Structure formats: structure tokens, C-alpha cells
């Protein structure tokens, strides 16, 4: 089917969203144009306002409308712990655990094949933040449990060890409520390697 230039432009714009292919973008565009024009207008306004008003926190680099995000602006947070994550979405996930320390958001993970080295993802800024703050006794490496995430955590841990700082890695393994027969071998091996005594 051939769409008019404006409809084609809308479909192509919607396709930049993760997980949205050609068919889904077409359905979204036609839904907005045929049945929910007020919703489309609200979406356009919200998107425009967010693109104009949302930037990065000057301390942790997560997304925020202020100079400091709510976590960095909160004086009650634990200044001895720094949690390093790959992206802003990970901050929201870690917050759900009740973690009360500070954050540093990388711009992804190390990926030499994609041209992403330490500078590209912000490791020099991370090390500068740790040195400037001077209060962190533990750096929690909460990068994703992928080959690249593990390599990134290992690289950062080596840099921290050279400075005499403690790095810890979040545990990986069997999900709570999961059944062993449904867990892949790599995940199960990681869980066995990271086993610990039961606290009584």
C-alpha cells in the first residue's frame, strides 16, 4: 500500500522505537490518525516537551529535567556506595530494590567491534567522579549479564583495584520463583559459581 508523504513520515518516525517494525508502525499511525487524534496531539506535545526539557544529571548522568536528578539531590542517600549501570533505565530498576546509595550511568558497555571503548561510554568520567567524591568505599558494578557487560565490569574492577578501591558485582543466576529445568546452562553455571552460605 502506498501512503501519502505525511503518513509515510509518521510511520518512519514511529519505527525508530525499539521493537516497532513496519506493520506495528503502520497500525500505530493509522490508529492515531483515524481514531485518536487528541491522543496523537498529546503524544506530540509530550514528546516535544521531553526532547526540549530532559537532559542528563551533571553528577550521575541519568535522565532528568533538573541539573541534579532526585537521587543525586537527596542528602539522605548513602555516600559510601556507588552503583554503576549501563543506562538510565537501569537506575529505575535498581531503585525498585530499595538501594539507597549513589549512581553513575555509563553510555552502554564496552564493545570494540562497535567502536565503543572506555572513553565512548564514560569510564574516565566515572573514575574522575570516584576520585572527586572521595567517599565511596564500595563500587557496585551492575552492568548487564552479557559478554559485553561482564567485560565492562571486569575492566572497571581492574581500574578500581589499581587505586585500592573495592568493587563488587551484582549476583546473577536462577530467578526467584524459577524452576531449574527451565534455566539455561550458562545461567545455572553462573549461579553455582556464585553460591554463598545460607545466613541463619
UniProtKB/Swiss-Prot annotation:
Residues 80-175 form the Toprim domain. GO terms for molecular function: DNA binding; zinc ion binding. InterPro entries: DNA_Rcmb_RecR (IPR000093), Rcmb_RecR (IPR023627), Rcmb_RecR_Znf (IPR015967), TOPRIM_dom (IPR006171), TOPRIM_RecR (IPR034137). It holds the Pfam family RecR_HhH. A zinc finger (C4-type) spans 57-72. GO terms for biological process: DNA recombination; DNA repair. SMART domains: TOPRIM. Keywords: DNA damage, DNA recombination, DNA repair, Metal-binding, Zinc, Zinc-finger. It comes from the Bacteria. HAMAP family: RecR (MF_00017). May play a role in DNA repair. It seems to be involved in an RecBC-independent recombinational process of DNA repair. It may act with RecF and RecO. Belongs to the RecR family. This is Recombination protein RecR.
